[in-house]
Structure formats: C-alpha cells, structure tokens
C-alpha cells in the first residue's frame, strides 16, 4: 500500500482513498502512528510524559481510509467511496500487482479520448480479464479469462470518470464483470497499452520472486 502511494505520488497524485475491509483498523493505526514509527523519538518522562519526534519524515499525502466491509465485492467497494470522490476524474488500482507504467501517460491518454473509463492492458498469460481491443484502442468486449485464452489482460491501472458510479449497484457488484462489460458494449471503455514490466502477486512463488527483485535493488516498478 505504501509503495503504491509512493508510485502515484511521483506523478503528482497525493490524495488517496483506500477501500479497506479485512483488518481495516490496522491500516488506520499504521497511518495514525506514521510519524512515531518513522522518526527518532524521545520520551521525556520528567516533563509530563512529553514525546519529542526528531527529524520527522512526511509525505505530501491526504489519505482517507474507508471501511468498505469485509465481504464487499470490488464494484461495491468503489460505490461506497463515491462521496469521497465527488465529481472528479479519478485513478483506481488494486494492491496485488506491480508495474513500471507511466501513470501520467495513462491520464493523458484518458483525457484524449473523452470516454468514461480507461484501463491499462498488458500481454501476459495470466488468469485476468480478457480484452478484445480494436485498432482505435477501444475495448470492444471485456470478460473474465479462461485457461484457453492468450490475449491482452487488464493490468489494474485505471482512470475513471465519476459517471461510472451509475454502473455500480450494491455490495455484490463485481466491477470486473457487468460494469466493465457494459462500458465496453457502450464504447465507453478504452485501453492504454503498456509493453513494459508488469507482474501480479497471487501466489507464494510470485511473492518470493518480487521480494527478491526488491531486496537486490532490481525492482522495475520502483520509480521513486
């Protein structure tokens, strides 16, 4: 989560809304204790238990952590944060993948076509949503992937207009199914094609691989 925010912050995006669920209180505690945990601290018990933080490190962030429920589906979670988004265009991403995509280029592409939604596509053989993309980068169809497929997949970096909230209904709504399928059918879903590094972290093997890249200073997604 912290690394995802560092990534977006490079491109000037510093206002975050986190769709929290399971153990959401731990996320809130982490931010609440951020300065305490990232600074040298003096506990002066001779002066009324005074706490002095030394060389405080801060980020230029505004973070809203929203309890969207433990069992809420992806579309339902996005719907629950609508009041914090308002009428602004916003970026949306997941926390289970890493990528070296230039987020400013995704936003630039999104603004160029005037549609409601832009997702980032990559060419990998993974069990993600399959895209049928036309020559004009319009997503002609969207569906969940089967093992027989080998096609562009949804990399999870999106730019969305506030009108997409009209496509979401209730906690059982799965964003990657009916909403994206309908947006594609209506010609309102576009694809930004990324041909650089992307990797999800769905298995222990993938976790070990990515941690190894990070620990050896070879993480392509570390753009900060």
Pin down the residues of each PLM region:
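Residue-level signal for inorganic ion chemistry
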Residues: 27, 81, 96, 110, ...
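Conserved beta-strand termini and adjacent loop/short-helix elements that scaffold enzyme active sites
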Residues: 46, 66-68, 120, 192-194, ...
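Catalytic-core segments of class I nucleotidyltransferases/pyrophosphorylases
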Residues: 89-91, 98, 102-111, 123-126, ...
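Conserved N-terminal catalytic core of the sugar/cofactor nucleotidyltransferase
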Residues: 3-94, 105, 203
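Residues at the starts of beta-strands that form the adenosine-phosphate
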Residues: 14-16, 116-117, 188
């Amino acid at each position: 989560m912290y690394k995802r925010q560092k990534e977006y912050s490079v491109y000037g995006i510093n206002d975050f809304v986190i769709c929290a669920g399971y153990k959401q209180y731990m996320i809130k505690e982490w931010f609440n204790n951020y300065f305490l945990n990232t600074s040298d601290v003096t506990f002066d018990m001779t002066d009324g238990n005074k706490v002095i933080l030394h060389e405080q490190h801060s980020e230029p962030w505004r973070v809203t952590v929203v309890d969207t429920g433990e069992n809420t589906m992806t579309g339902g979670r996005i719907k629950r944060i609508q009041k914090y988004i308002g009428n602004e265009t916003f970026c949306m991403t997941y926390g289970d993948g890493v990528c070296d995509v230039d987020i400013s280029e995704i936003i630039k592409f999104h603004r160029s076509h005037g549609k409601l939604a832009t997702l980032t596509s990559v060419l990998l053989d993974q069990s993600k949503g399959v895209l049928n993309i036309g020559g004009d980068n319009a997503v002609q169809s969207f569906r969940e992937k089967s093992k027989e497929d080998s096609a562009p997949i949804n990399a999870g970096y999106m730019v969305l207009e506030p009108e997409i909230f009209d496509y979401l209904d209730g906690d059982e709504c799965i964003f990657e199914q009916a909403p994206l399928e309908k947006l594609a059918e209506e010609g309102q879903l576009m694809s930004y094609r990324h041909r650089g590094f992307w990797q999800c972290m769905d298995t222990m093997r993938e976790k070990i691989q990515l941690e190894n890249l990070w620990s050896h200073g070879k993480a392509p997604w570390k753009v900060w």
